[in-house]
Amino acid sequence: MPSNFAIAGKLTREYLLPPNNGIARLDSPGGNLLYAIGGLAVWDASIVMIARVNQAYPREWLQDFSNRGLNTNGIYLDPERDHVDMRSFIAYTDVNERSHTNPVSHFARCELTFPKSLLGYQPQDETVKDLRETDPLAPVAWHVPKEFRNISHIHLCPFDFTSQSQLVNLFKGGSSHAISLDPAPGYMKPAFWRELRIVLSGVTAFLPSEEEIRSLFWGETHDLWEMAKRISDYGPQIIVIKRGALGQFVYDAAEKRRYEISAYPVRLIDPTGVGDAFCGGFLAGYQRTNDPVQAAMYGSVSASLKIEGTGPFSPLDGMPGLAEARLHALQEMVREV
């Protein structure tokens, strides 16, 4: 069956200590690619995975992705990256406070035995000093099989600037392509604005968090709508600012209209990957409706389902019809401003 979507992102071996002493996930499939897929698969599972892994990545996980109906032929096994650590660690000290460091102390705080498989873990330095630096396990444009380059709806998860820009160039050739991009926080700084503007010309929808977009315009403006307008001047016709529990701001550049969407109210279990799940849902909604506000509502539903569970595929555990019911309810939670 042909795939409607391609998502490029990172895969990790995830160690997660959720908020409120939730059930720990130890050496489980993680990474922003999977969380975005979980949000999209609520609506449509015909997805090509674009990623890069080394030989330490469990083959049985790849088989599980295939069993779920995902196309794994875009995952490139790179034997030259076997020295790279694929582990990730996330611990919540509070519902909204997460840490990627000092795993030993976090396991002790949670009164959990420290897993031997996490020994020697060091978090990746996310500081960006040079935009030409690449992440050793980010997906690479020239590894994408040719048969996937004509897929019409593509989402790029956060990873390094160079790899993202090369993938935008790879996919933007077709007039029917819709590319959404979630920026990596490391390069959302005023010093990198000139380079970012070049990449934006090939992007349909730009999906930053409020924190990221404020960082980009630090010292220039506090007005989120002005920020969205300035970004749209360089190409993206849709700007969605993800605002966590406050919902989303949606700027429709083509119509010059602004919308505020409330977050669907749910009980928070684990916010890990909620922004990625939103982006996956957004892409599904945009493919179905070609409408930025409707697309953001699809994303909001996916985000709400993710918050209620732990693990990238938890949005798929909802009762049949739940996503559609929430989508209907959200129609009343949109306000034009």
List each model region and its residues.
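Conserved phosphate-binding/catalytic region of the ribokinase-like
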Residues: 2-3, 153, 221-337
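Short, hydrophobic/glycine-enriched beta-strand segments
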Residues: 2-12, 180
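Conserved N-terminal subdomain of the carbohydrate kinase-like
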Residues: 13-17, 21, 46-153, 324-337
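Alpha-helix C-terminal capping segments
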Residues: 37-46, 285-288
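Short, conserved phosphate/pyrophosphate- and ester-handling motifs at nucleotide-, phospho-/glycolipid
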Residues: 40, 209, 275
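Short beta->alpha connector loops
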Residues: 54-55, 158-163, 184-189
